[in-house]
Design a protein with these regions (language model features):
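Active-site-adjacent loop and "lid" segments of alpha/beta metabolic enzymes
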Residues: 10-39, 43-47, 53-54, 58-118, ...
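Short acidic capping loops at alpha-helix termini that bridge into adjacent secondary structure
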Residues: 126-128
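Catalytic domains of carbohydrate-active enzymes, especially glycoside hydrolases
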Residues: 1-6
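Active-site metal-binding loops of divalent metal-dependent hydrolases
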Residues: 135
Length: 178
């Protein structure tokens, strides 16, 4: 199992957390749990990822797919950590404001393919990369259902697929939509 530790909520509408506060939140938790299993550091910030990895985290779980902080790719290359690249349209404050796609499956696939290529070009081995289509992040109920139905498409990228399942509001909306 993987223990994912983060100090900044990335749910839609969440407020930004400064680096100092985020580091103070995650450092003692990573310290206390590093020996309990595989630790993932859930952050968009390169310095928080580096600190977590140096304390024992093995995975950099970045909901921005290395887009938020330009130093993130260097942290991966320098530390040898694994990465989970997630698709999210916009940032937590704006991602649910009228999310639109030409074709959600192909748009998310193309985005993640480009991010994987970016990592490969930086020397990160494909065995260190996983992808997450970002269910609930900048997507409508219809988008989420299309992504779940078409999940097998993402195997074409050549990386393991991870899905975050915490607090998925759309699950409750499915019953209302039927």
């Amino acid at each position: 199992s993987i223990i994912d530790i983060g100090g900044e909520s990335t749910r839609p509408g969440a407020d930004f957390v400064d680096r100092f506060s985020e580091l103070n939140r995650v450092s003692p938790v990573v310290d206390g749990m590093a020996n309990l299993g595989i630790i993932s550091i859930d952050t968009r910030k390169a310095d928080i990822a580096r600190a977590g990895i140096l304390k024992g985290a093995k995975i950099f779980n970045d909901v921005s797919s290395l887009s938020f902080d330009p130093r993130s790719l260097n942290v991966l290359a320098e530390t040898g950590a694994s990465v989970c690249l997630m698709h999210a349209s916009g940032d937590p404050q704006t991602m649910q404001v009228n999310p639109t796609y030409d074709n959600v499956l192909l748009d998310v696939y193309d985005f993640l393919s480009l991010k994987v290529k970016l990592c490969l070009d930086a020397g990160i081995d494909i065995s260190k990369i996983s992808i997450d289509p970002g269910i609930g992040f900048g997507k409508t109920l219809e988008h989420n259902l299309l992504l779940i139905r078409g999940l097998s498409l993402f195997h074409g990228i050549g990386c393991p697929i991870l899905l975050g399942v915490s607090r998925k509001r759309f699950i409750g909306e499915i019953g209302k939509a039927q």
